[in-house]
């Protein structure tokens, strides 16, 4: 169904679960969900759209077993790669155990706390293939979200809803991660 300003409230939604419940209340249902920066998976997306085809994307290899477990219960696939404006390779800052917040923004070369990862674009992954519509894309890329979208100029024309999980304010203890104002400027 078509969503118009007349059919929506002007309320701010701060939590992903709240936002998805509102979207569902408008009788909208995703057939394809693309979760960029999926890490451990996004339970709110899985629960809101249990019958959708879920595409989980994260470059950190330690999440692979978790992705396999999720896809034992939900229909979909996973990709162990970063998403950016252009394809190639990059170094990813992975603090501690490799299962914490990682970011492409924090590092540009190899270091003790980095891993080399392949980089794809949304266009290279999804333009050549058919996906069931409607499509929802969620990013949680620790400040790299707009870079993801820059590599999806053609694909994004097929996307119905795009959600960026960003920090409104700089996270305590992570001065390398941007806040909302830095991401959108």
List where the protein language model places each region.
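Phosphate/nucleotide-binding beta-alpha loop and adjacent structural elements of enzyme active sites
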Residues: 2-185
